[in-house]
Amino acid sequence: MMKIVFMGTPEFAVPSLERLIKEFGVKAVFTQPDRPKGRGKKLSISPIKEVALRENIKILQPQKLRDDREAIEFLKKLSPDFIIVVAYGQILSKEILDIPKYGCINLHASLLPKYRGAAPINWAIINGEKFSGNTTMFMDVGLDTGDMLLKDEFKIEDNTTAGELHNKLMESGGELLVKTINGLVEDSIEPEKQKDEESCYASMLDKKMAKINWNLESEDIKNLIKGLNPWPLAYTYYKGTMMKIYEAEIIDKKEDFSPGFIIDVSKGGIKVATKDGILLLKKIQFPSKKPMYVEEYIRGNKIEKGIILE
């Protein structure tokens, strides 16, 4: 009987845990401690804890696993075949990495060695990559630097947002983990070292990077809009008021206007000049209003052409 311990926290990790429960069973789940959330600061449990409670699996929530002797001794006593890690949010010490028979396996949402780090899905889209995917790897003490095991690859379609790619990779990750576990048990996978010279780092997102620079090319602005949807959302200022942008498309036409200039407003959207052409803003949101397509917004509100977005 296979002994698997799962470590994960957000929604992204849920299908992986559910698939492993179905295929092998899971002996214990590690997830981040409950956190205060919302205005009432009510304690909120992680999506992974919800699954573990539902499935009646033992739950451990150490504040800092690497320093928690009780949790480490629990793992040593259990002596698992695998520790599977999907977006857990804590770094594992060498002492923990050495516990399982076959090793600690991580599912990472990029085609490693590209996009190591916290926000691989977003940066793949912001940088205009044509492909993305999941990679399983042996964990070592570095950040996403371990030997690679298996990959699945997807084409990033032209209008794919970070949210859509997140969901696609989230749903496919569990199957890749099952193949990885079976392959390691059967000794049919040849681990592959990462080439550090081909790596790049996907740093955490912050709201400062979400402000649109209209002096960039249309393609770069469109990629930023897609890559920051659903969070933190790219934005600009219309007459001093923040306008978030959910969706845009490039118009292949060069007009001689200053970047950020609103050329036209119609049901189809807001035409804005960029460094090399025109971007059509299709779905927007103003403070305290819901996101709307421009066609709907201009029925009851005015957006003037001739204004420069800042």
From Swiss-Prot:
Membrane-spanning intervals of the chain: none
Enzyme class, first EC level, given as a word: transferase
Example GO molecular function: methionyl-tRNA formyltransferase activity
GO CC annotation: cytosol
Binding positions ((6S)-5,6,7,8-tetrahydrofolate): 110-113
Reaction(s) this enzyme catalyzes, per UniProt: L-methionyl-tRNA(fMet) + (6R)-10-formyltetrahydrofolate = N-formyl-L-methionyl-tRNA(fMet) + (6S)-5,6,7,8-tetrahydrofolate + H(+)
EC number: 2.1.2.9
Xref: InterPro entries: Fmt, Formyl_trans_C, Formyl_transf_N, Formyl_transf_N_sf, Formyl_transferase-like_C_sf, GART_AS, Met-tRNA-FMT_C, Met-tRNA-FMT_N
Disulfide cysteine pairs (residue numbers): none
Keywords carried by this UniProt record: Protein biosynthesis, Transferase
SUPFAM superfamilies, sorted: FMT C-terminal domain-like, Formyltransferase
Pfam families: Formyl_trans_C, Formyl_trans_N
Domain of life: Bacteria
Family listed: Belongs to the Fmt family.
PANTHER family: METHIONYL-TRNA FORMYLTRANSFERASE, METHIONYL-TRNA FORMYLTRANSFERASE, MITOCHONDRIAL
Role of this protein: Attaches a formyl group to the free amino group of methionyl-tRNA(fMet). The formyl group appears to play a dual role in the initiator identity of N-formylmethionyl-tRNA by promoting its recognition by IF2 and preventing the misappropriation of this tRNA by the elongation apparatus.
The protein's name in its UniProt record: Methionyl-tRNA formyltransferase
Organism this protein belongs to: Clostridium tetani (strain Massachusetts / E88)
